[in-house]
Amino acid sequence: MIERRETRAKTDGAVSASRSRGRRARALTAISLAPLTWLAACAEPRDPGGQPLAEVKAPTATHAPSAKPGPAPPPTLRPSVGAAAFEPRLVRLEEGAMGTRIVIQSFTTPELEEASLKGAMLAALEEIRRLERLMTTWRDDSEVSRINAAAGGEPVAIGPDTFAVLEKSLWIAERSEGTFDISFEAMKGLWRFDEEKSDAIPSQKDIDQARKKIDWRKLSLDREARTAKLGEAGMRINLGGIAKGYAVDRAAAVLEQRGLAAFYVQAGGDLYVRGKKPDGKRFKVGVRDPRGKHDLDYFATIEVEDHAFSTAGDYERSFIKDGKRYHHIIDPRTGWPASACRSVTVWAKDAFMADAIDDAIFILGPEKGLALVESIDDAGAVIVDASNKVWISKRLEPHVHVFRRPTDAP
């Protein structure tokens, strides 16, 4: 039997999410498809003298490392002067990669000064950019582009990273009734929610024609040879719905290898939180109101430690036409935007899993979606369905505080 709870409104509190400079705010992370903001201790990090803390300057994409993976260098430990009076400082990196905003934050410790944290963050960013070059469809020489170019032909040899993401994609497709299908790229251009945004609605004829090239079962993987093959000419894959979660986990691994014990890594709506705040308390994640006024408008919070989050929502890449909302989460079984939910926030042990299942849960709807998430170890979900009801998976209930109903609007 599916374990679920329908949560009604609670009015026992509210979250302050001011961006004003220097103003103290709660330790809260906004989780949404929009870029997230980590409010760990104050709205803007400052040093003990009150001066704003400069962000890490990241290299441009042209300075990304080679595609050849290698072990992260050992941590650089530099004992701080006056450790007895040590006060942690927030260090932040913000850059663009994988078509979204990358944010990495951590605190200085007596063993890891600001320079060491900056070096670790830049190494983590470089790892994300290395993976981007392998899995993007914007480069003809990426492994994903080479698989697409060879559709209907011979298998394509790929590296272990891309193979791992493809393998997980097929695993989720099978468990989600095909609602997560990376061969959905065949519909590219019909719906335009990104760079070339348009409110033009494709015809049913065009949708049906494109859907003939969508079938995850025609992607063949050979683990021994480490190859991938699309079985029909004209088929295409896109890893945009899962690769960012994998990249977040790999970046987190780099930070851990550099000696960081408390940090967060965010790529768009995918987030991993490691450790606790300097005061020993857990961080909190804010769950965005899908019809809220801005991306820091929350209706619930979740305590988090050593876990990841990923959100799928109908409110970012979307448009409203003739009173109806159209958004980028397309049901591959119909070719039309899924209509069962407004938002899904997935909690999991790693970002790879969270990113892999949030869209599937969104498309399946609350009952089947909760059944899916409960079937996966150490995973949970908060769902706002199309009628604005809030559903919380049994495993996640003890960690969630819903303090008001989400806004009810189209």
Residue ranges of each PLM-predicted region?
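Mature catalytic core of soluble alpha/beta enzymes
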Residues: 2-6, 12-15, 19-410
